[in-house]
Amino acid sequence: MVVIRLARGGAKNRPFYNIVVTDSRNRRDGRFIERVGFYNPVAAEGSERIRLNSDRLAYWTGVGAQVSDAVAKLLKQQAA
């Protein structure tokens, strides 16, 4: 099954997450099919906190990719 989920990057105590499309059997930070955005929870005041390529996100959900709970929460937060 193909899922859209967060892959952690960054450093200790400085998390940075890539929003990726991957096979559900792959590791959290392992191989992925496509990167569709990022989420920076510790972004500075003037910098971008979340970016999503909505066209690619719509494509992948259209072909049956499941969205993880964390990514669904980010989508809802960005829409508001």
From Swiss-Prot:
GO cellular component, one term: cytoplasm
Name of protein: Small ribosomal subunit protein bS16
GO BP, one annotated term: translation
Keywords noted in UniProt: Ribonucleoprotein, Ribosomal protein
UniProt similarity note: Belongs to the bacterial ribosomal protein bS16 family.
GO molecular function: structural constituent of ribosome
Protein origin, superkingdom: Bacteria
Gene name of the record: rpsP
One Pfam family per UniProt: Ribosomal_S16
HAMAP family: Ribosomal_bS16
This protein's record includes keyword Ribonucleoprotein: yes
